[in-house]
């Protein structure tokens, strides 16, 4: 189940965090709270059961209709799919890279086809932790400071939309704030 936790940016540390300002697993509350901060959050049906050996082209073909709908306005001409499993050879290196606070010059749009991941958005004096699960689509606007945790045993597949043909390009902030917040097990 999707979940939102809003914390003060001055969280003490990951093992004894400050009390959250808000916690909810109500989809309407999650959508409304994120919308107040310029973040789009939607539920799309992940209607295709993918084979465990599905490759990127299979995933993109399975969701061709949804991809075409998003790309129709021309904002996101580039799309790919990422699938990380507990046996992925680069899972730990990828986790560490995504855990560092960063921004993008373009929106970060992710549709979770399978599994889950934790987006942490550093907006003003707050950190919003958004647990995204299958069927969730999140659009993090360009320039938003954030990090992503896939957990120590990741199991997710997401379709990623880009307005940049080069795909995922991050500008790391150098802020160690992510170390003060809980991560996925």
From Swiss-Prot:
Q: Which domain of life is it from?
A: Bacteria
Biochemical pathway = Amino-acid biosynthesis; L-methionine biosynthesis via salvage pathway; L-methionine from S-methyl-5-thio-alpha-D-ribose 1-phosphate: step 5/6
**Could you tell me the keywords of this UniProt record?**
Amino-acid biosynthesis, Dioxygenase, Iron, Metal-binding, Methionine biosynthesis, Nickel, Oxidoreductase
Gene3D superfamilies noted in UniProt: Jelly Rolls
A single GO BP annotation from the record?
L-methionine salvage from methylthioadenosine
Q: For binding Ni(2+), which residues are annotated in this chain's numbering? A: 102, 104, 108, 146
Which residues are marked as site: May play a role in metal incorporation in vivo?
A: 101
Q: So where does Fe(2+) get bound? A: 102, 104, 108, 146
Q: Please give the Pfam families that the UniProt record associates with this protein.
A: ARD
Q: Which InterPro entries match?
A: ARD, ARD_bac, RmlC-like_jellyroll, RmlC_Cupin_sf
User: What's the stated role of this polypeptide?
Assistant: Catalyzes 2 different reactions between oxygen and the acireductone 1,2-dihydroxy-3-keto-5-methylthiopentene (DHK-MTPene) depending upon the metal bound in the active site. Fe-containing acireductone dioxygenase (Fe-ARD) produces formate and 2-keto-4-methylthiobutyrate (KMTB), the alpha-ketoacid precursor of methionine in the methionine recycle pathway. Ni-containing acireductone dioxygenase (Ni-ARD) produces methylthiopropionate, carbon monoxide and formate, and does not lie on the methionine recycle pathway.
What is the name listed in the Swiss-Prot or TrEMBL entry for this protein? Acireductone dioxygenase
Source organism of the structure: Prochlorococcus marinus (strain MIT 9303)
